[in-house]
Amino acid sequence: MFNRVQKEINQIINRGFDRTLRLAVTGLSRSGKTAFITSLINQLLSINQHSSQNLPLFEAARNGSILAVKRVSQQDLSVPRFDYESNLNDLSQNPPQWFQSTRGVSETRLAIRFQRQSGLLRHLKERGTLYLDIFDYPGEWLLDLPLLNLDFQQWSQEQIKVTTGVRAELAQNWLSMLQNLDLSAVANEDVLAKIAKSYTDYLHQCKAQGMQFIQPGRFVLPSDLEGAPALQFFPLIHLSGEHWQTLKKTAKSNSYFAVLTKRYNYYRNKIVKGFYENYFSTFDRQVILADCLTPLNHSQQAFLDMQMGLNQLFNNFHYGSRNFLHRLFSPQIDRLMFVATKADHITRDQIPNLVSLMRQIVQEGGRHVEFEGIDTEYTAIAAVRTTKQVIVNQQGKEIKAIQGVRSIDKQLITLYPGTVPSKLPKTEFWQKQPHFDFDSFEPQPLEQGESIPHLRMDAVLQFLLSDRFE
């Protein structure tokens, strides 16, 4: 008991004096969270060797405020350590490889030793140490957070809105099984498992079609819950409001309706809420990553799917200004950065368009954030740069292009991907074929001792960390 109280007191003191910064790196599946965290760690550790030469926009590195950076033991010993070394080893292979996708939660802690340049504490303590806690987790789990505000009926009705177009075609099998289910009958475990598997298969098919709004997220990446009854439910999108009310009044406790409701509530209250409280309710700063380019290359529905997923994230984080007392007793996010990833997949002149598009995508969900006095920033980056900018001569004209090793066939190619729309694409954009010539690229070879090549990670570090070294 005493140790727990002492630990909480130490956390409050450290938070109040800015000794600890908890960074939430959030984003939908395939947005590049693991690459972002790996590069962020690498850029900070590289300050020990390369000083500021690779991070010219990061003032604390440029002016010598940061004295040393090292990885240290994390506080929560029950969470796996982020496998930075393995990721770095993948980039050092010949040929280099991309990292394994995230399968569960992991954590890392960096100790950043620095010399204060300003502020009251420079008189009290010449040097300080900032502990930076960073978490990685599957993007699939992130989109379960909106369930915290929805009961089973509300969630089912939300799914009606998205089961259209391509999704409606993919859903035919599980919908036909659902239509034939008597929700008032006594529940059979085998029948529930069979329909839940059909619904899970549907979610996997949506993901394969480029959709990113996948709920429940654990259905496609269950981790240690695979096969558990907690993952064997599905939305009742065929019920009218009147039918819902009738079943709530008349369905017995052992009926399909009651069992499905109970499982949804368990999933929301135990699994999703536990995940949120353990990892998301106490963050100080947040980065929201979005791959805007892949949906542009895919379909209008994939793009709208991504936009809807991002806009649903904002309801589950506490934004607002942070003074000394706030930091002590009410942790909340005070700096928020929206980051468009894979900026190395387009030519340099298209990056302003990509940033503008990112603004457009999040505008509706993020508008209230700006009104609460929180610092917000929009940028485009490549956490791991895979291409180089080149000029090609075509029919006597010089054209900007990119060059890199294409993932699908490992061939070195040079191409102009096209124009990135600066605003939300209209119907005419999707009628063009192709909408956008977007390829995936392999990482560049990483030599021993070199820092990971990047695009604008120093701007990210400047926005997220600079005030802690003043």
From Swiss-Prot:
Role noted for this protein: Binds GTP and GDP. Has intrinsic GTPase activity. Does not hydrolyze ATP. May act as a transducer of stress responses.
Similarity-based family: To E.coli YcjX.
UniProt binding sites for GDP: G32, K33, T34, A35, W98, S101, T102, K342, D344, H345, A383, V384
One Pfam assignment: DUF463
Entry keyword set: GTP-binding, Hydrolase, Nucleotide-binding
Motif, Walker A motif: chain positions: 27-34
Molecular functions (GO terms): GDP binding; GTP binding; GTPase activity
Full protein name: Ras-like GTPase HI_1637
